[in-house]
């Protein structure tokens, strides 16, 4: 019984240790990477794989989730009081909607990827920026149009660009 309790304690410790808190200073990329060195490695890997600039990856994460790994869109209100449905299925650092996230997992052969992991989220953002560059011919260095395509989707972006 004591061994069982120790095992449970160790499991809880590792599970809670894996949960990532929001960085103290989300306005400064150097401070973020100083606090979370692995995030720099993950962002750099996404840059090397997809060509998506690191500052653009961080800007997307900041705008979409403010570095909150559990971020979800706010619920709509029924009769202006009762919490109701969420307007979309977006979740995690990247706030990717379910359909696009599933497409990413299929195309990158990453069946275990989750948007609650920073590594997977910045890889997704890199993939999305790369695909936007190929589909809509938007430069990877054009943050305004890249974010517009990220926010609106590839189909709706054609109307505004």
Regions found by a protein language model. Give the residues of each.
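Solvent-exposed, acidic/flexible segments
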Residues: 32-40, 49-54, 72, 86-94, ...
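Sec-dependent signal peptide recognition
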Residues: 3-10
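Export/targeting segments at the very N-terminus of extracytoplasmic proteins
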Residues: 20-78, 130-137
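Mid-chain, structured segments of secreted extracytoplasmic proteins
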Residues: 69-110
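Iron-associated oxidoreductase/ferritin-like identity signal
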Residues: 2, 19, 111-112
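Conserved small/polar residues in nucleotide/adenosyl-binding loops
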Residues: 159-161
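Alpha-helical segment that forms one wall of the substrate-binding/catalytic cleft
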Residues: 93-145, 149-156
């Amino acid at each position: 019984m004591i061994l069982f309790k120790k095992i449970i304690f160790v499991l809880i410790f590792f599970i809670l240790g894996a949960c990532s808190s929001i960085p103290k200073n989300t306005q400064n990329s150097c401070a973020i990477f100083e606090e979370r060195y692995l995030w720099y490695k993950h962002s750099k890997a996404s840059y090397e794989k997809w060509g998506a600039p690191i500052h653009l990856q961080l800007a997307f994460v900041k705008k979409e989730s403010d570095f909150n790994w559990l971020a979800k869109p706010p619920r709509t209100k029924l009769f202006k009081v009762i919490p109701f449905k969420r307007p979309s299925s977006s979740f995690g650092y990247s706030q990717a909607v379910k359909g696009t996230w599933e497409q990413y997992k299929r195309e990158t052969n990453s069946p275990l990827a989750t948007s609650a992991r920073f590594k997977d989220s910045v890889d997704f953002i890199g993939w999305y920026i790369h695909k936007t560059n190929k589909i809509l011919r938007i430069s990877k260095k054009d943050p305004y149009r890249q974010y517009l395509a990220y926010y609106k989707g590839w189909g709706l972006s054609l109307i505004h660009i």
